[in-house]
Amino acid sequence: MLKDKSQKFDLLLFEAYFIPLLALSHLFKAPVIQVSSLGSMEENLQIVGAVSHPLLYPTSLHQKVYDLTLCDKFAELYNEYSINQVLNRFIQKSDEVLSRIFGVEIPPLKELKNNVDMLFLNIHPVWERNRPVPPNVIYVGGLHTKPEKELRKDLKTYLDSSKHGVIYISFGTNVEPALLPPHKIQAIINAVSKTPYDVLWKWNQDELPGRTPNIKISKWLSQSDLLRHPKIKLFITQGGLQSTDEAILAGVPLIGMPMLGDQWFNVEHYVYHKIGIKIDMDTISEEKISKAIHTITKDDSYRQNVVRLRTLMYDQPQSSLERAVWWTEYVIRHSGARHLRAPAANMPWHQYLELELVSYVVLGLLSVITLAIIVLSYLYKFVQKQAAFRIKVKGS
């Protein structure tokens, strides 16, 4: 299919992180909508000309967002630089691979980026610090959420019968909890075993070493429906975006233990919006977990803040799915949406910052300053000579 140019498509929908897929836009000559299943990345924002600032409007791979110290700012700037270097090498290698597959006639990715008509971001604007974006960037946060369904009978019975409530633990699909250091797993077990709550833990193995009677494990759980159950007191999570959305929609406070990707970014927002507590996996301990559980379960403000944030996020004239469908049909109706692209779209940073103009201004100022120094130096020497001449005349 990839080499069959007779194929016709009205629209191409790509995962935004898979930049090499833009080669298909050249082959099939169809409009492109990039869909980011996470938040924004520097590369995606640059393609559409959206504002990006590593400190004011950080992208989702930044680990520190609020209350930055001077050292934090340097660290985040270096983080941004490192990510861009990795991405540049990836783009270079991707160009080589695409040339081998499709031949030398395939344009480089830096040109193919101009074929992007629209960007869908599966994140809420408030989670992006209300980043200014052009009209072809559409926020569809919570797109993956589904209407509530009945829980399976055994799970519903377990939750309904809990006397004091249930703590739910899941580290998502990209983290295998069984591979965590045993002492960290044991710290979690020790902390939750000392609470009056039942514990439901998504665990991919047949047995959890050191499991106490109040802990129930399961390899798969309908998370979004589970979180909506009124007996859920708290969600201990790795901080993934989809898990975060589901917890907010269910009104459940969180304890975040970030481990990779955008998880630090998301957990930073837990703390800022006062909907949860962050625990660093490098310094995790039974005492820290116990304190976090006690704080959240005894302080109703965390749950109230989640409910308030949910109201702010979802008080919109249409759902994320309806918005995504409308704009998808819009792009198809108009055979693209190039008219919505910002002037800065896919513009190199040196052009975006007008470094050529800045260099001319700096050179002009340096020329004026240099000329002024030369003139003043000449005048100074001239005055000195005149003064010396007058003294000589008077002495004679």
Give residue spans per PLM region.
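C-terminal amphipathic helix plus adjacent low-complexity
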Residues: 101, 111-112, 119-120, 286-396
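Short loop/helix-cap segments at secondary-structure boundaries that form the rim of catalytic
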Residues: 22-27, 43-46, 127-135, 206-214, ...
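Conserved nucleotide-sugar donor-interacting segment of glycosyltransferase catalytic cores
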Residues: 1-66, 125-127
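Classical protein tyrosine phosphatase
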Residues: 19-45, 137, 179-200, 243-260, ...
